[in-house]
């Protein structure tokens, strides 16, 4: 498995302290649709990938950290690394039931995507089972559009880069 970055304690992408996992692939749909380079993660795209031999170690790191309450998957585009994203989500669900979880339980899961729900609904459907493990499962939808106003999202508790972007709970989509 490869990722772009791993931040054990991130306080910028969600209202709760979170582990941030940057996924390594993107089709750059935001750039293509507006006809200019607008990717907020363009520097990250050129950074080397980080090879993860044992993804379970990421899960253990999360559960051993007393500060974090959520896991955020972000840029590049998590759904362009669907198999790895699914593997990590499954590991977090299993980890929430293990001795590593101690009293933490299932973290809130947040996925930042540039896709719209109708573009990835077939990928979202299998994740429905994960909502039974506890914690919120939130997805931020919408491509970045330059020269649009920023918008505060109540569900995420953060300001989003353009006003067409929004977050929804997975259970409200399925």
Residue ranges of predicted features:
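Extreme N-terminal starter segment of soluble prokaryotic enzymes
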Residues: 1-3, 107
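Canonical Radical SAM [4Fe-4S] cluster-binding loop centered on the CxxxCxxC motif
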Residues: 4-53
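A cross-family glycoside hydrolase active-site/sugar-binding cleft signature
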Residues: 22, 74, 110-114, 142
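Canonical radical SAM enzyme core domain
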Residues: 42-60, 79-128
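Conserved glycine-rich "GG(E/T)P / GGGxP" loop and the immediately following alpha-helix
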Residues: 67-97, 142-161, 171
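Structural recognition of alpha->loop->beta junctions
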Residues: 122-148
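Charged phosphate-binding loop/patch that engages nucleotide di/tri-phosphates or the phosphate backbone
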Residues: 164-174
């Amino acid at each position: 498995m490869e990722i772009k970055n791993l931040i054990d304690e991130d306080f910028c992408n969600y209202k709760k302290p979170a582990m941030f996992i940057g996924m390594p692939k993107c089709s750059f749909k935001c750039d293509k649709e507006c006809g200019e380079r607008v990717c907020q993660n363009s520097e990250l795209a050129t950074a080397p990938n980080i090879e993860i031999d044992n993804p379970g170690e990421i899960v253990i790191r999360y559960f051993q950290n007393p500060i974090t309450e959520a896991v955020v998957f972000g840029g590049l585009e998590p759904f362009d690394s669907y198999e790895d994203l699914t593997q990590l989500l499954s590991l977090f669900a299993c980890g929430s039931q293990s001795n590593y979880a101690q009293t933490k339980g299932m973290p809130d899961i947040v996925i930042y995507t540039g896709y719209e729900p109708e573009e990835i609904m077939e990928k979202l459907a299998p994740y429905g089972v994960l909502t039974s493990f506890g914690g919120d499962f939130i997805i931020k939808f919408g491509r970045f559009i330059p020269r649009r106003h920023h918008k505060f999202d109540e569900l995420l508790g953060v300001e989003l880069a353009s006003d067409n972007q929004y977050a929804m709970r997975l259970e409200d989509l399925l």
